[in-house]
Amino acid sequence: MVQETNGRKTGLLASLDWWTIAIYVALLIFGWVSVCGASYTFGDTDIFSLSTRSGMQIVWMATSIILGFVILMLDDRFYDTFSYVIYGVLLLLLFATIFNPHEIKGSRSWLVLGPIHVQPAEFAKFATALAVAKFMSTYGFDMQNWKHFAAALSIVVLPMLFIVAQKETGSALVYLSFFLMFYREGMPGGILFTGVAMILYFVIGIKYEQVLLWDTPTSLGKFAVLLMVQIFSAGMVYDYCKDKAKALQIASVSIGITLVFLLFSKFVIPFDIVWIQIGISILLIGYLLYHSLYTRMRNYFYILIFAIGSIAFFYSADFVLNNVMEPHQRVRINVLLGLDEDLAGAGYNVHQSEIAIGSGGLKGKGFLNGTQTKLKFVPEQDTDFIFCTVGEEEGFVGAAGVLLLFLALILRLIKLAERQPFSFGRIYGYCVLSIFLFHVFINVGMVLGLTPVIGIPLPFFSYGGSSLWGFTILLFIFLRIDASRNFTN
C-alpha cells in the first residue's frame, strides 16, 4: 500500500502539466513587477517592505504557491466528492456578506475579519465550477433536456444573484462566461446567438437612438434593430427549419417593403417608418405562429419567441438603462458608447489609462519610470487598471508579451480540457478557461476603452490576496484533476 502511494505521488509529478505551471509562474512574476510599478512612489526606498503593496504582494504570491502545492497533494476524488459541500459553504458566505455592515468603495462584497479582508465572490467561482461540473457529469444528464439545462443554469445564477445583492454587478457578470462551457457541452447555439443579438440591440439601439436616418424623422437605432430582428428571424428559419424558400420570402418582403417606404419618406412625405417596421414585425410574428401551428414544428415556435423577445428587449433597454442601472453604471455606458465624454468624471479612469498606455510607446519607459502611474493620475492603477502600468513601463512589446502569455494559458487549458477521460474534468476545465478568458478580455478591454468599466481584476496581476488565491485555486484544482488522468481506472 505504501509502495502504491509512493508510486502514485511519483507518477503525479510526472503527470503534472509543467507548461501550465511555468506560464502561471511567469504571470506571477510579471504581475509582481507591474504591482511594483503601479504602487511605487518617489519616496519609497524598499519595494520588498511589507509596508508597501509590492511587499505584501510577495506574501500573497508565496501563500498562493503554498496553496497550490496543498491542492496538488490532495486526492483528486476529493474535489468531485465534496463539490456540493464546497459550493454550499461559499453560498452561505455570499449570503452572509449581503448583510455585512462594512462597505468598501460602495460594495458589501468583503468580509472583514480584523485586519484581514476577504472577498468570497472570488472563491465562489471555483466552487460554482465544481458544482456545475459535478451536476452535469452525473449519469443521465442531457443538455438538450430543458429541465436538466435549467437546473445546471440555476447553479450558476444563484451566486450571481447574491453577488448582485452585494452591489458587485461586475463580479456577477463573470458568471456569464459559463455559457461558453454550456455551449461546448451541447447547449443549442441559438441561445448563445440570442445573447449576442441582445447585446447588439442594446448597443446599436441606445447609441443611435437620437440619430436620424437619411434626413427622415426615423431613429436610426430603432430602424437598425427592427431590421436586424427580421433578418435574424429569416436566417433562423433557414438554419433551424431548413426552409430556404420561406427564409428568402421573409427577408425579401421585410427588406423590400421597408426600402419602399424609406424612399417614400425621403422623397414624398416624411414620416417615421419605424411604425411600418412594427407592422411588418407583427405580420412576421403571425406568419411564424401560423407555421408553428400548421407544421407542428417546435423550431418555428422558438423563432417566434425569439422575435417577440427581441422586440420586447429592445423597447425595454431604454427603461433598464434609465431606471434599473445605478447612476454610475449608466454614466459609464454612455461614456463607452460615446454619448457622453465626461473626461473629468466617469471617463477619467479610461482616459488616463489610455494616456499611460500611449505614452509607453514601443518599448516603454522602463521599470519604475512610468510618470502617469507614479503621479497617481490613474485611479485603481494597481488593481483593476494595472494593465495600463504594463503598457506605460514595458510599452507595446511588454503589453503584447503579457497578452501572448494569457493566450498561451487559454490554449493550453483547452488542450488539457479536451484530453480529460471523464466529463467532470472536461466540464470543470472549460469553466476555468472561460473564466480566465472573460477576465482578460473585459479587463484589458476596459483599460483600452473598448468595454464597460465593471471593476474586475486581471488574473495574477491585480493587487490583492483574494483575487490571487481565487485564481490559483481555480487553476490548480484543474491541474490536479488533469494529473490524475493516468491513474483512473
Language-model segments: residues:
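Glycine/serine-rich anion-binding loops at beta->alpha junctions
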Residues: 115-124, 166-167, 361, 453-472
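N-terminal membrane topogenic signal
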Residues: 7-24, 54
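A juxtamembrane structural motif centered on a specific transmembrane helix
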Residues: 1-7, 233-238, 249-261, 443-489
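Transmembrane helix boundary and interhelical junction motifs in multipass membrane proteins
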Residues: 168-173, 364-370, 381-383, 454, ...
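Long extracytoplasmic/lumenal interhelical loops at the membrane interface
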Residues: 354-357, 361-394
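Hydrophobic alpha-helical transmembrane segments of multi-pass inner membrane proteins, especially
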Residues: 25-34, 41-43, 47-344, 388-446, ...
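Helix-boundary and loop/linker segments of multi-pass membrane transporters
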Residues: 12-14, 149, 375-378, 420-421
